[in-house]
């Protein structure tokens, strides 16, 4: 594992490996494993400054925020009064989407259709959590099962491409299946668990590239895939951002930003009321994501997504910096379980452990090495930031 405590950490910038003196933020724990991070004279990083300058003044998890989201909820009810469901919520079994379901039903009085995508990597824990939530609240569940042979082929292609963003096949399937379903069935409101409370520090793109960049997904699959993606759900970022929004009239709503949302309290409420089971860390409801984020990324690239996750919790007062430093110094999860996951992932992908190890040891690449729409995405991000619709740093 790359020891990032040393000065002279190697960081990747496109195809070039460059050296930069190691620095860690004095306020959160983001560091120069994000090669584009910057620090002010106090040693505070640009993520922290952006939080205090742009996010916090415009974030209202208070009476004002609740009043605003209740007005939106009334509009959702009016627009969906003649339908079986007035909105749709994609769920993974994780805390954000699970707590959102409770808020939507009980606080906002909505009638959501619960939408789940089974990409082949669900933990039993995540399946149980979804079932308990749906049964406990008396909601309808629609599950879309991805063709495993196509999913496996696409995931193998990303392994062979040697890029950090191995979760793109799963993430793309999740969002494409949801929005394609909404567009097909005339659903006008998609509620998401995206929030500032646990996600105000975004992972840099060199750690986790846009899963919605269909050009890149197709280019990697063209080079390394072996099976046609006949049924795999696909949706380009511009289809999602423009066509579905302005032609199909689909609106994305993020209610967690309008209420006080504290991760530990939310998990405890879910556990007490529904028998919901807690995870070791964010996104670990998927066995593949647990392995990819907790083992593969730190081992192969020196990227630890927990830095962004913990830094978000530090900024929102849910975790002390000292505790975050203690946590980040430890492996993401049990090392014996990591070894079991390594063997499980290899077997499920029809690889030997030696073949998976060879991929781990292969030359690292990035999204720059394959076709991408980053230029156009950047223009869109800049435009949204200019009109105040994009508050978080995305780079």
Residues covered by each model-derived region:
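Short, glycine-rich nucleotide/cofactor-binding loops
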Residues: 87-96
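Hydrophobic positions on the alpha1 helix immediately C-terminal to the Walker A/P-loop
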Residues: 99-100
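Nucleotide-activated chemistry modules centered on ATP-dependent adenylation/adenylyltransferase
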Residues: 12-14, 18-87, 103-395
